[in-house]
Structure formats: structure tokens, C-alpha cells
Regions:
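Bulky hydrophobic segments
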Residues: 1-145, 150, 164-181
Length: 181
């Protein structure tokens, strides 16, 4: 059995981020601090989403519960591949689950096209963005107390779509205003 704490995952994500940004700086032989500041929005999205997705909101003895990897309990995988079947099942917190899964990813839809020039259309942003929840759902598979659900991917991608729609809508309005002026 192996336990991953939020603090451990936070340190891992942070060190990986710093190493990646340092390698990019060395490769490019310069650091664009304005761009690095923009990229912090992506980093914040990663850290916050990792906290919400991998670590339950309930506290155990006053601390964030650990993520437990137990090889003997991996199978059977907890996975739902049939969309919408369980989405509207009424249980405590079902509405919060739906709203939370959408709103949690709106910042991704805003941050990614803001930071990455190649994500210059709504379609590209949503298509690339959909890979992020797919990655998250896949990485939850080995953890017996987590489940992977196609509905989460659909809801998360909807959040990315909403965020990108806001981003490109504001950008369009700004461009129109500049043309009129």
C-alpha cells in the first residue's frame, strides 16, 4: 500500500513545474517574465483541480485525506463508460457534483487560450482541453477509493467550453470595440 498526501502531490507538481519552466528558459536562452506570469494561471488551475479531484473534501482527523494506492484493491476498476445514465441519480450532493464538475474547469477554458497562442479558436481549446479531464479520469483508475466516469469528462469539458466561450467572446467584443474606436 502506498499513500499520496496532498502536500506530497503539491510539492511534486510544483517541482515539476519549476523544472519544466527552467528547462524552457535554458532552451530559449531567456525568460519572458510576462509570459511566465500568465502561465501561473495554468499552474494554479493544475494545483486547485488536483486538490479537488484527488483528495476528498472531508477531513480525516483534521487533515486532508490521503490518496491510497493498494495493488490488491485496484481490480475491479471503478469505471462508468455509459454517459448520462447515473448523472441525474438523486443522492446527497448530486447537484453539487454536476455544478462542481462544470465550474471547476471554467478557469481552464479561460487560462489555456490566454496562455497558449496555438489555442486560437473555441474548437481547438475545447478539443485540447478535453484531454485534461480524460487524463485525470485515467489517473484515478489505480486508486480503489476513486472512480472514473465518462460523465465527469463530459461535465469537465462543458466547463472548458464555457470558459473558452467567455474568453473568445470577450476577445471578440474587445476587437470590435477597437475597430470602432
Amino acid at each position: 500500500m502506498f499513500e499520496i498526501t496532498y502536500k506530497g502531490l503539491f510539492i511534486f507538481i510544483t517541482l515539476a513545474w519549476i523544472a519544466t519552466r527552467a528547462i524552457c528558459g535554458i532552451k530559449n536562452k531567456k525568460v519572458d517574465w510576462k509570459y511566465e506570469a500568465k502561465l501561473l494561471t495554468v499552474y494554479i488551475c493544475l494545483v486547485v483541480i488536483a486538490r479537488i479531484v484527488y483528495f476528498p473534501m472531508r477531513l480525516v482527523e483534521g487533515h486532508i485525506a490521503s490518496l491510497v494506492l493498494d495493488i490488491e484493491k485496484i481490480f475491479p476498476l471503478w469505471i462508468n463508460l455509459i454517459p448520462i445514465v447515473h448523472l441525474f441519480d438523486v443522492y446527497d450532493g448530486w447537484l453539487i457534483n454536476i455544478i462542481g464538475n462544470v465550474t471547476m474547469f471554467i478557469p481552464v477554458g479561460l487560462a489555456w487560450p490566454f496562455c497558449f497562442k496555438k489555442l486560437d479558436t473555441l474548437g481547438k481549446t475545447v478539443l485540447v482541453g478535453a484531454g485534461f479531464p480524460l487524463f485525470i479520469e485515467t489517473t484515478q483508475l489505480p486508486f480503489y477509493d476513486r472512480c472514473s466516469d465518462i460523465d465527469d469528462i463530459i461535465l469537465n469539458t462543458t466547463g472548458i467550453f464555457i470558459g473558452a466561450l467567455i474568453y473568445f467572446g470577450v476577445k471578440l467584443l474587445k476587437n470590435r470595440k477597437n475597430r470602432i474606436s
